[in-house]
């Protein structure tokens, strides 16, 4: 009797039940990852939530989590791979500006040390006298806004003097004072000259050009270059009144911009020796 039942059961043993939904399927699919049989609806690993996927996901999470070293510090693989990727343009530009700023600060500190006490005294006396004259002129308008700066630049272009051979796109329009320290010729020092120079020039060449435009006596430039006879100074930005010397080897395009006020300070023989 039992043999007959076994034989009958064997005859009916066609197809297999799906391990996921228990539905009988005559063409079952065998999953080699979890070693189970599934119907056509659950033949994929994702469809029957294969154990291999779950185990693989746990291993992946373990590998991805930060591992702690002996000293307790954690090493993040994700941070390491991000460091290998190029940074965004905005981040790169910000980092370049941050690295350039200290360079300019260190350069300014070095240049400031080249202004000896007599030169500083000369330019400060000139500046104080000039500011006092401005404060007495109460009717003078304030041109501090950006819109007024545009008007100022347009007016400066109309009266500025310079070499007509300089291309229009290379011209930088400035105001320039000659600071000589000669008390007998204060009117000449108080004259602010509207000029334009070439932004492609070295500062040393601009100093030569400015000394000629400011009608410096020819005897001043004999037996020596204007770089030795003069220092080109500029007022630092900020509330505190402070000047720095623009080095002759620097470029105009990097140091001078439109509407800047420059001070061409004459060095006497005894000042150079200090």
UniProtKB/Swiss-Prot annotation:
GO MF terms, alphabetically ordered: proteasome binding; zinc ion binding
Record: residues binding Zn(2+) 1: 18, 21, 39, 42
Gene3D superfamilies documented for this protein: AN1-like Zinc finger
Other remarks on this protein: Present with 4280 molecules/cell in log phase SD medium.
Gene Ontology biological-process annotations: cellular response to arsenic-containing substance; cellular response to arsenite ion; proteasome-mediated ubiquitin-dependent protein catabolic process; stress granule disassembly
Annotated positions of the Phosphoserine modification: 273
GO cellular component, one term: cytoplasm
Pfam families listed in its UniProt record: UBL_ZFAND1, zf-AN1
Keywords carried by this UniProt record: Cytoplasm, Metal-binding, Nucleus, Phosphoprotein, Stress response, Zinc, Zinc-finger
Lineage of producing organism: Eukaryota, Fungi, Dikarya, Ascomycota, Saccharomycotina
Binding site for Zn(2+) 2: 31, 34, 48, 50
Localization: Cytoplasm; Nucleus
Zinc finger (AN1-type): 12-58
SUPFAM superfamilies in UniProt: AN1-like Zinc finger
Region (Ubiquitin-like): 170-266
Name used for this protein in its record: CDC48-associated ubiquitin-like/zinc finger protein 1
Protein encoded by which gene: CUZ1
Superkingdom, taxonomy of origin: Eukaryota
Subunit (UniProt): Interacts (via its ubiquitin-like domain) with CDC48 (via N-terminus). Associates with the 26S proteasome. Specifically interacts with the regulatory particle (RP) subunit RPN2. Exposure to arsenite, a known inducer of protein misfolding resulting in accumulation of polyubiquitinated conjugates, enhances the association with the proteoasome. Binds to ubiquitinated proteins conjugated to a 4 or more molecule ubiquitin chain. Binding to ubiquitinated proteins is zinc-dependent.
Function: Promotes efficient arsenite-induced clearance of stress granules (SGs). May have a role in the ubiquitin-proteasome system (UPS) protecting cells from metalloid-induced proteotoxicity.
InterPro entries, A to Z: AN1-like_Znf, Znf_AN1
Expression triggers: By transcriptional activator RPN4.
Transmembrane segments: none
Organism: Saccharomyces cerevisiae (strain ATCC 204508 / S288c)
């Amino acid at each position: 009797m039992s043999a007959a039942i076994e034989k009958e059961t064997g005859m009916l043993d066609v197809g297999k039940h799906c391990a996921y939904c228990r539905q009988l399927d005559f063409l079952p699919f065998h999953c080699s990852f979890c070693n189970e049989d599934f119907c056509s609806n659950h033949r994929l690993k994702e469809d029957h939530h294969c154990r291999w996927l779950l185990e693989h996901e746990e291993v992946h999470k373990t590998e991805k989590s930060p591992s702690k070293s002996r000293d307790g510090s954690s090493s993040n693989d994700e941070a390491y791979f991000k460091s290998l990727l190029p940074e965004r343009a905005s981040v790169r530009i910000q980092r370049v500006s941050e690295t350039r700023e200290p360079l300019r600060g260190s350069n300014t500190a070095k240049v400031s040390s080249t202004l000896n006490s007599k030169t500083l005294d000369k330019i400060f006396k000139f500046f104080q006298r000039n500011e006092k004259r401005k404060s007495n002129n109460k009717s003078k308008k304030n041109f501090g806004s950006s819109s007024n700066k545009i008007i100022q630049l347009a007016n400066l272009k109309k009266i500025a003097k310079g070499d007509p051979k300089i291309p229009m796109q290379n011209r930088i329009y400035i105001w320039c004072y000659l600071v000589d320290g000669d008390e007998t010729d204060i009117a000449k020092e108080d004259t602010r000259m509207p000029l334009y120079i070439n932004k492609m020039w070295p500062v040393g060449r601009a100093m030569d050009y400015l000394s000629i435009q400011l009608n410096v006596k020819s005897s001043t430039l004999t037996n020596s270059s204007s770089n030795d006879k003069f220092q080109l100074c500029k007022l630092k930005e900020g509330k505190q009144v402070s000047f720095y010397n623009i080095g002759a080897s620097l470029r105009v395009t990097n140091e001078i911009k439109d509407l800047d006020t420059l001070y061409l300070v004459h060095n006497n023989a005894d000042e150079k020796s200090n």
